[in-house]
A protein has these predicted regions:
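N-terminal amphipathic/basic-hydrophobic helices that include classical n-h-c signal peptides
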Residues: 1-15, 335
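Hydrophobic helix-and-loop "lid/oligomerization" segment in the mid-to-C-terminal part
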Residues: 17, 23-145, 167, 218-339
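Short catalytic-loop micro-motif centered on adjacent basic/acidic residues
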Residues: 92-93, 148-150, 173
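Short, ordered loop/turn segments at secondary-structure junctions
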Residues: 95-96, 123-126, 153-154, 169, ...
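Short alpha-helices
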Residues: 106, 182-226, 238-242
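Phosphate/diphosphate-binding loops
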Residues: 147, 151-163
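Amphipathic alpha-helical transducer elements in NTP-driven molecular machines
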Residues: 158, 183, 203-206, 210, ...
């Protein structure tokens, strides 16, 4: 018995063997990065992470991929611009998780900043299933919606899109999940769909709707829509939400995603963020002045995901949409209690 206990203690106290993965480094890329002014250690780390050249180290917004490469992005922008000009009711169909919630908040805030009549709906997946189902299409029609916009879902909603069409509703699907052979019969913006030349296949759902909003702003600008009464919005103000959703969805941080996250974190560290994000930092006892990807993935994201355990799954979205600190703090506390 004594021997058994001693051997068990030895196993418990044995240091864990670390598994070190050595990534292959392209020496030519490494030299190019050093020649461009990168520190040799940073150059080696970047070359081992498939950074192809110095341009990929730029984190300016101007280095983002152009939305023109994202298939149907401009088509979606034209339809949304028409809806805004006609003041049609746009209903966003979202999911409650961190990517879906941030995508919904980005969609609502971006559309409203451009004068749209926009609202959202979060299907209760235990009652209605996931995403745009026929039941959700019927509820949307009953609520007076004219155009449905899915965020972070919809690529598999064949039946829901068909039911919406039968009810006279049009649908735009924005999603990033891998499509099956059959896709819904509507406008689809998804970097992973067939024939899409957008190089960042890792764009999160929140990133897809952000690119659609950039295309929409350009389309409205082309129509001379903005004026002194309704000024052109600064979409950079949504990057705190984009960064949060991108990190929390654990998509690979390719160059395009790295720009979105880096810019969002810079804004957070300056205190430029939604009251809901600030409140989530506070309840998680994290310092937003030193915001890191860790905070997004392990402190804020899980608290938004906790809304899935509530009867009302839209509490996470409500927290992100809150326009004042008091409302944001109440909702963040609710999410914190659940987490």
């Amino acid at each position: 018995g004594v021997l058994k206990a001693a051997s068990a203690a030895a196993v418990r106290n044995r240091p864990m063997s670390a598994k070190i993965q050595v990534r292959p480094v392209n020496p030519q890329t490494c030299q190019t990065l050093i020649a461009a002014g990168a520190d040799p250690l940073i150059a080696r780390l970047c070359a081992a992470r498939d950074v192809a050249g110095p341009d990929e180290l730029l984190d300016k917004l101007s280095a983002l991929l152009p939305y023109t490469l994202l298939k149907n992005c401009e088509t979606a922008a034209v339809r949304l611009a028409d809806a805004i000009e006609k003041q049609e009711n746009i209903l966003i169909v979202a999911d409650y998780d961190a990517d879906g919630a941030t995508a919904c908040a980005v969609g609502i805030k971006g559309l409203q900043a451009m004068g749209a009549r926009a609202d959202f709906m979060v299907p209760n997946r235990f009652e209605n299933g996931y995403g745009l189902t026929p039941e959700i299409a019927e509820a949307a029609a009953a609520a007076g919606a004219r155009l449905l916009l899915t965020v972070d879902n919809g690529i598999a909603s064949m039946a829901g899109v068909a039911r919406a069409a039968a009810l006279g509703l049009e649908v735009i699907v924005t999603d990033h999940h891998l499509p099956a052979e059959e896709t819904p019969d509507c406008i689809i913006v998804n970097p992973n769909q067939k024939g899409c030349g957008f190089q960042s296949k890792s764009l999160a759902g929140v990133g897809v709707i952000f690119f659609v909003l950039m295309a929409l702003r350009a389309e409205l600008r082309r129509r001379n829509y903005f004026s002194d009464e309704l000024k052109e919005p600064n979409l950079g103000e949504l990057l705190d939400l984009v960064a949060l959703g991108t990190v929390a969805d654990v998509v690979p941080l390719d160059h395009n995603n790295r720009i979105l996250v880096s810019q969002g974190l810079k804004r957070m560290r300056l205190g430029k963020m939604r009251p809901g994000i600030r409140a989530l930092f506070e309840v998680a006892r994290r310092d937003w002045r030193k915001a890191q990807p860790f905070d997004m993935g392990f402190a804020l994201g899980p608290r938004i995901n906790a809304a899935g355990r509530l009867d009302d799954m839209s509490v996470g979205i409500a927290c992100l949409l809150a326009d004042n600190d008091a409302a944001a703090q109440t909702l963040a506390a609710q999410l914190n209690d659940l987490n």
